[in-house]
């Protein structure tokens, strides 16, 4: 008897209000870290109807022109006309950024050159063999759809599209392997002139069938395109957006646990971000090495402490090695102190704007060092000793 179930993940476009906030926060981080690698940045953004507020804490010698940074991000996303509900020219930009607490900083910057964790917390990484990039299929497909929504809007293939949008994909699994797409939900902001019939047909034809892998498509997929019937009011005019509210979209679409810490706007001394990247790096290399088919990795830290307080590996019964053996391997092969992570993944670079939409994982860009599988041979060698 086949074990059959559906699993669903979602994604959002770069014009979604929460993603706008993430992108502004990461643009501020990139601006500062490019000029001051010793900076400590925790940047939070709120976007709402007609305004944007940037707040958080900084420790840096760099002056960051918050207004210019925010407006450039909003312009690049595509909010270039007041008719879209938000316009980069006329939106107010408020700056409420303060200084980082010296009580926090004293535990991070150490006299011995090491870096203490910027906070306590637990972070997860995940990898599996469902896609070439070792990501779960549902979130992989959902990101493909939202990325295509933005591209078809920007290249004028579908000129009636506007920046805000979401996707959701339900995948059918049999015996824990994905076999087909069951349901696709796409909600996209649009101009008032386009008919719902034309919009739905165009989105299915130009995006779904031209973007998604043919082996998962079939005639009985259930499509819900703008199921409420109209989506003209969108972006910050429709909903306020905040940094860090799309943490499942940013990671694995719900396929593994999440420690709760968001990424955007945080420099890599914050283990919420850097250790989550490291956990993905570990999980992906474990799967790429062939010692398992699926891996969930948890790392945990205490504020001001150098070494992780715990390392946990779960291979979901896909490995001949025990969790204890795998954890020993991970500690031997990977540098999991904050400084070790920053140096091994080369994280003191202005790369974070690239991560702030369409997922931090599963995108094999040159800048995404945590997606490399250059530790796979070392893992194999560890188990041949």
From Swiss-Prot:
Cofactor binding, per record: Binds 2 divalent ions per subunit.
Enzyme class (EC, first level): transferase
Q: Where does Mg(2+) bind?
A: 18
Is this entry keyworded Transferase? yes
Which terms in the Gene Ontology molecular function aspect does this entry carry?
Answer: ATP binding; magnesium ion binding; methionine adenosyltransferase activity
The processes (GO biological process) annotated in the record are: one-carbon metabolic process; S-adenosylmethionine biosynthetic process
Q: In which pathway does it act?
A: Amino-acid biosynthesis; S-adenosyl-L-methionine biosynthesis; S-adenosyl-L-methionine from L-methionine: step 1/1
Residues noted as binding K(+) in the record, renumbered to the chain: 44
Disulfide cysteine pairs (residue numbers):
none
The cross-references to SUPFAM superfamilies, in alphabetical order and at most eight, read: S-adenosylmethionine synthetase
Its job: Catalyzes the formation of S-adenosylmethionine (AdoMet) from methionine and ATP. The overall synthetic reaction is composed of two sequential steps, AdoMet formation and the subsequent tripolyphosphate hydrolysis which occurs prior to release of AdoMet from the enzyme.
Q: Which PANTHER family match?
A: S-ADENOSYLMETHIONINE SYNTHETASE (PTHR11964)
The record describes its quaternary structure and partners as: Homotetramer; dimer of dimers.
What's this protein's name?
S-adenosylmethionine synthase
* Protein's organism: Helicobacter pylori (strain Shi470)
Gene that specifies this protein: metK
């Amino acid at each position: 008897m086949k074990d059959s179930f559906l699993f669903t993940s979602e994604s959002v476009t770069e014009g979604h209000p929460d993603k706008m906030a993430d992108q502004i926060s990461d643009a501020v981080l990139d601006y500062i870290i490019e000029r001051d690698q010793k900076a400590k940045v925790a940047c939070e953004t709120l976007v709402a109807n007609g305004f944007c507020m940037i707040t958080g804490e900084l420790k840096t010698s760099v002056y960051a022109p918050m207004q210019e940074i925010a407006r450039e991000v909003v312009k690049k996303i595509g909010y270039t006309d007041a008719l879209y509900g938000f316009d980069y020219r006329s939106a107010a930009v408020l700056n409420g950024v303060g200084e980082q607490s010296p009580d926090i900083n004293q535990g991070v910057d150490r006299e011995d050159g090491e870096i203490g964790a910027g906070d306590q917390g637990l972070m997860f990484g995940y990898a599996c063999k469902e896609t070439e990039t070792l990501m779960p299929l549902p979130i992989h497909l959902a990101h493909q759809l939202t990325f295509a929504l933005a591209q078809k809007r920007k290249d004028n293939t579908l000129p009636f599209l506007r920046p805000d949008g979401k996707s959701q994909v339900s995948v059918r699994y049999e015996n824990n392997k994905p076999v087909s797409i069951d349901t696709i939900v796409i909600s996209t902001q649009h101009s008032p002139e386009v008919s719902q019939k034309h919009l739905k047909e165009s989105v299915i034809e130009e995006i779904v069938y031209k973007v998604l892998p043919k082996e998962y498509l079939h005639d009985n997929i259930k499509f819900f395109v703008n199921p409420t019937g109209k989506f003209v009011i969108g972006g910050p005019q429709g909903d306020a957006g905040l940094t860090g509210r799309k943490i499942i979209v940013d990671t694995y679409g719900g396929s593994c646990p999440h420690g709760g810490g968001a990424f955007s706007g945080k420099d890599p001394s914050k283990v919420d971000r850097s250790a989550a990247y490291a956990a993905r790096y570990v999980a992906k290399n474990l799967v790429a090495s062939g010692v398992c088919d699926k891996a969930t990795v948890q790392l945990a830290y205490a504020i001001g402490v150098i070494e992780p307080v715990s390392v946990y590996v779960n291979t979901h019964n896909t490995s001949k090695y025990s969790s204890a053996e795998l954890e020993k391997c991970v500690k031997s092969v990977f540098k999991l102190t904050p400084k070790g992570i920053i140096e091994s993944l080369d994280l003191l670079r202005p790369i974070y704007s690239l991560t702030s939409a369409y997922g931090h994982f599963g995108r094999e860009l040159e800048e995404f060092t945590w997606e490399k599988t250059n530790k796979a041979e070392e893992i194999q060698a560890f188990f041949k000793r």
